[in-house]
Every structure is written in structure tokens, then in C-alpha cells.
Amino acid sequence: RVGRDGQPAGCAYPTTKFAVNGLTLSLARELAGKGIRVNAVAPGVTHTDMVDALPDEVIKPLIATIPLGRMGEPEDIANGVVFLASDMASYISGVVLPIDGLART
């Protein structure tokens, strides 16, 4: 969501998300004629060592904002990447795939 709507404080984070969106679409258009697809993933809160180090008072409110009711697992992100790299996605290019439990961070 921040990469689409921005946020009022701290412009660096949404700026990098906007950059990934723009770069993905621009490269996809630039390379389409060569048969090269360009896509990206936008992972939400994912169960990692970094997240495990956060206190419960930080994690619980984050999970409460995720409509699917849980944080992602690394395998969730990997599955999206494998799909985008597969022949099943051969007609998909210029997409930033949110893998975020509908949180749209």
C-alpha cells in the first residue's frame, strides 16, 4: 500500500517502493521485444530471524492488520517467485506481485 499511496512520515521507504514499481514496469516495456519478462514481488511481513527478534507488542499489532490473519513464511514468497519464473507466467510481465496476505504493505 505504501508503494501505491505513499505515507506521511519518512519518505525513504515509500520512495524505494515506488522505484521498484517504476523500474519493473519500465524494464518490462524495454525488454519485451527481446522476449524478456520482468516482474517483481512485494512481500509483506514474513517470518524471518529479523521478525522473530521483534517483541510481541510489535508483532501482534502487525499480524492484526493482515486480513489472512498470519504473517507470511519464506516459502510463501518463494512460491510466488517460482510461479513468476515459470512457463505458467509466460504472458505476465511488468507486474509487482504482492505476497502479503492482503495487507498491501
What residue spans do the PLM features occupy?
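Short C-terminal tail/terminal secondary-structure segment
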Residues: R4-D5, V82, S93-T105
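Active-site "substrate specificity/gating" loop of NAD(P)-dependent dehydrogenases
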Residues: R1-G10, A32
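Catalytic tyrosine of NAD(P)H-dependent dehydrogenase/reductases that use a Tyr as the general acid/base
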Residues: Y13, N21
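Active-site helix of classical SDR
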Residues: T16, T24
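Short, flexible catalytic-loop segment of classical short-chain dehydrogenase/reductase
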Residues: R4, V38, A42-A53
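Alpha-helical segment proximal to the catalytic Tyr-Lys
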Residues: R29-G33, S90
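A conserved structural motif in NAD(P)-dependent oxidoreductases
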Residues: I66-I77, M88
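A short C-terminal helix-loop "cap" of Rossmann-like NAD(P)-dependent dehydrogenase/epimerase domains
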Residues: D52-I66
